[in-house]
Regions:
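Conserved H-loop
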Residues: 190-196
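ABC-family nucleotide-binding domains
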Residues: 157, 164, 168
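Walker B catalytic motif
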Residues: 129, 158-159
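Hydrophobic anchor residue at the start of the ABC signature
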Residues: 142-143, 171
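Conserved ABC ATPase "signature" region
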Residues: 108-125
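Conserved beta-strand-loop-alpha-helix hinge in the C-terminal portion
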Residues: 208-231
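ABC ATPase nucleotide-binding domain signature region
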Residues: 44-107
Length: 249
């Protein structure tokens, strides 16, 4: 594997008062990372920085791609906001992008897109305007658009949020079938939903990565739960083992 992204003691400023880091982290092509940590630990901020936002204050950040595809609350709102601002006006002939237009924007792999449209039952929506869809429908479209995209890096920040139970199951099955050789960065607050195709974990605490390395998903579900308990109770964490998931008694 070759490095796709390298952070070397990088500290980022993401707001007037907020910083993240220092962080040293290497993401290699094809790796599937699960980003874990308590609420407020910096998971979403870190993914946003990998996407290309924020200003580096110190250290180095190399290889951050310009064509990462993102599923997140922020990406969802940005797409809705784009459609609203682009087409709100007196000229009624501009009614917004169709669902088919939205799905075709990111150079999709046609066979994958066709199958995902079938799985999520989006065919009746293709001719509708994106801005006219329900929240759940827009979430499905954003997910399908991202997974079908021909891109090297897929960033998934709570990708199941806003989906009904049936669509969540379809989404997880589709990820297992179609992530393929893509590099994936995934945040899920539900440890039980951690997919079997994940092969690495990074655990954040206080804006820093405390643990990173290869992992077995089955062992990791228990390990991550114990890490959260230890952090919540302010207990001393075990010594980092960067090359493997540490076993906790």
């Amino acid at each position: 594997m070759s490095p796709l992204v390298t952070l070397d003691q990088a500290t980022f400023r993401f707001s007037e008062t907020g910083t993240l880091g220092p962080i040293s982290w290497q993401i290699e092509s094809g790796q599937k990372w699960f980003i874990a940590g308590r609420n407020g630990s910096g998971k979403s901020v870190l993914l946003g920085l990998i996407e290309g936002g924020g200003r580096i204050q110190s250290g180095q950040a190399r290889g951050i791609p310009q064509n990462a595809v993102v599923v997140s609350a922020a990406a969802h709102l940005a797409l809705i906001d784009r459609e609203r601002h682009q087409y709100d006006g007196a000229d009624d002939k501009f009614k917004g992008s169709s669902v088919a237009d939205i799905l075709s924007e990111l150079n999709p792999v046609d066979k994958v897109l066709t199958e995902l449209i079938r799985r999520f039952q989006l065919q009746p929506l293709l001719g509708q305007r994106f801005r006219q869809l329900s929240t759940g429908e827009t979430k499905k479209v954003l997910f399908v658009r991202a997974l079908a995209a021909n891109c090297p890096l897929l960033i998934l920040d709570e990708p199941l949020a806003g989906l009904d139970d049936g669509s969540r199951e379809v989404a997880m099955d589709s990820l297992a079938d179609f992530v393929g050789g893509k590099t994936v960065l995934l945040v899920l607050n539900d440890w039980a939903a951690l997919p079997d195709w994940i092969d690495h974990v990074a655990y954040l605490s206080g804006g820093r990565i405390d643990y990173q390395g290869p992992m077995d998903p089955t062992a990791a579900r228990s390990w991550l739960g114990q890490m959260v308990v230890l952090t919540n109770e302010a207990q001393a964490l075990p010594a980092p083992l960067p090359s493997s998931v540490p076993g906790l008694s």
